[in-house]
C-alpha cells in the first residue's frame, strides 16, 4: 500500500518502475489541466486593429454620441482552414454586468470588416454578415454609451475564427451564438477600446 506523507511526499511500498512513471503522469495532468483552464489562450493568434489602437479611446463617431456605426476592423493572421468569423463586442464595466453591443456571425474569412454595417438581421453588402440582438434589444451594432460620470469603460472587440459556418437565424441571442460556436473556435483575437461620458 502506498503512503504519501504531507511533508516529504515520500512514497512507501511503490515499485521502482512505478516511481519512475510518477513525474510523467504528473506532467501529463498539469498539461491537461492547463488545457481545461486556459481554454482559448493558445488560440489567441489573430491581430485585430482599427482606427484606434489597443487600449486607446474610441472616436465619438462610433458611439451613441456620434453616428453610432461600427468601426472598421482589420484582421491579420487567419489560417487557411477558417470557414467563417464571429464578432462579439462587449463592455465588462457596465453597472449591471457585461453588456453586449454587437454580435455577428457567418462572416467570410476576410481581412477587413468595413465600418457602418447596416443594422439588419442579414446583410450581403459590403460583406455577407448575419447579426443578432444586442443588450439594447436591437439588431446590429450599437456603440459605447456608458452612464455619465461612471468612469472609463473598456470595450472588447472580439474576433473568433471558426472551422464551420453556423446554422443560426438572424436576431439570435448571444447565449445562442456562444452555444453554436462551442467546439468550433480555432483562432481568436481582440482589440480593446476605451470610452467615457463625463
Swiss-Prot record:
CDD domains: PEBP_bact_arch. It comes from the Archaea. Pfam families: PBP. InterPro entries: PEBP (IPR008914), PEBP-like_sf (IPR036610), YbhB_YbcL/LppC-like (IPR005247). Belongs to the UPF0098 family. This is UPF0098 protein PH1269. The lineage of its organism: Archaea, Methanobacteriati, Methanobacteriota, Thermococci, Thermococcales.
Amino acid at each position: 500500500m502506498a503512503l504519501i506523507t504531507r511533508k516529504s511526499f515520500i512514497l512507501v511500498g511503490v515499485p521502482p518502475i512505478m516511481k519512475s512513471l510518477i513525474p510523467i503522469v504528473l506532467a501529463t495532468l498539469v498539461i491537461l489541466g492547463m488545457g481545461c483552464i486556459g481554454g482559448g489562450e493558445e488560440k489567441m493568434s489573430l491581430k485585430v486593429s482599427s482606427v484606434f489602437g489597443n487600449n486607446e479611446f474610441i472616436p465619438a463617431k462610433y458611439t451613441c454620441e456620434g453616428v453610432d456605426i461600427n468601426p472598421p476592423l482589420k484582421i491579420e493572421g487567419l489560417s487557411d482552414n477558417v470557414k467563417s468569423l464571429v464578432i462579439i463586442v462587449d463592455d465588462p464595466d457596465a453597472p449591471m454586468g457585461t453588456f453586449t453591443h454587437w454580435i455577428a456571425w457567418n462572416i467570410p474569412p476576410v481581412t477587413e470588416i468595413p465600418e457602418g454595417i447596416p443594422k439588419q438581421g442579414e446583410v450581403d453588402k459590403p460583406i455577407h454578415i448575419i447579426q443578432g440582438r444586442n443588450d439594447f434589444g436591437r439588431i446590429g451594432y450599437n456603440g459605447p454609451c456608458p452612464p455619465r460620470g461612471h468612469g472609463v469603460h473598456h470595450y472588447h472587440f472580439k474576433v473568433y475564427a471558426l472551422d464551420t459556418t453556423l446554422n443560426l437565424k438572424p436576431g439570435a441571442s448571444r447565449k445562442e451564438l456562444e452555444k453554436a460556436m462551442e467546439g468550433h473556435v480555432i483562432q481568436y483575437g481582440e482589440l480593446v477600446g476605451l470610452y467615457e461620458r463625463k
